[in-house]
């Protein structure tokens, strides 16, 4: 019997740290907006949580983000920094997680790496968008993360550009 898989791309615009990364992300994301994926826009990253539906054997999550979002200080509380930890508790050993980070991103601590190994099916990270070979996603979740301690004006501007494209996109 064929495994039922859900492929989700999560894009947090705080990944953008400079003009080059803005250009790279826009070039990567814009073509995906016109494919047959469900596109979800939201200001807050942890609002992705309800889009992980039960009934799948495997969840493939690609997360383009400056932060790993697995578990930070208050990891028992569902928020923008801990949503993957909460998903990994619900979908134990079913999530293949690929984090597209920045060279400046802080990687999970040893304590969190142990939790990652115990709860995720797999975990990989890379700083290059080209590491994402998948071109078809069931869902694409794009968030802004507008808090000034997390994002830059380039990241917020990119989110607003994507939001405008989606608002102007003809519906079928």
Language-model segments: residues:
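Conserved alpha-helical scaffold segments that buttress catalytic/binding sites
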Residues: 2-172
């Amino acid at each position: 019997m064929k495994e039922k898989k859900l492929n989700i791309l999560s894009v947090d615009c705080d990944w953008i740290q400079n003009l080059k990364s803005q250009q790279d992300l826009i070039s990567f994301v814009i073509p995906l907006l016109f494919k047959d994926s469900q596109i979800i826009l939201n200001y807050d990253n942890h609002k992705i949580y309800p889009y992980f539906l039960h009934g799948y054997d495997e969840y493939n999550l690609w997360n383009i983000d400056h932060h790993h979002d697995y578990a930070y200080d208050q990891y028992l509380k569902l928020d923008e920094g801990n949503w993957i930890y909460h998903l990994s508790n619900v979908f134990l050993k079913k999530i293949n997680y690929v984090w597209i980070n920045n060279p400046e991103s802080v990687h999970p601590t040893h304590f969190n790496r142990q939790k990652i190994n115990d709860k995720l099916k797999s975990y990989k990270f890379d700083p290059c968008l080209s590491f994402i070979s998948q071109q078809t996603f069931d869902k694409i979740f794009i968030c802004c993360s507008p808090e000034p301690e997390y994002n830059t004006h380039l990241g917020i501007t990119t989110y607003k550009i994507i939001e405008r494209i989606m608002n102007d996109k003809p519906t079928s």
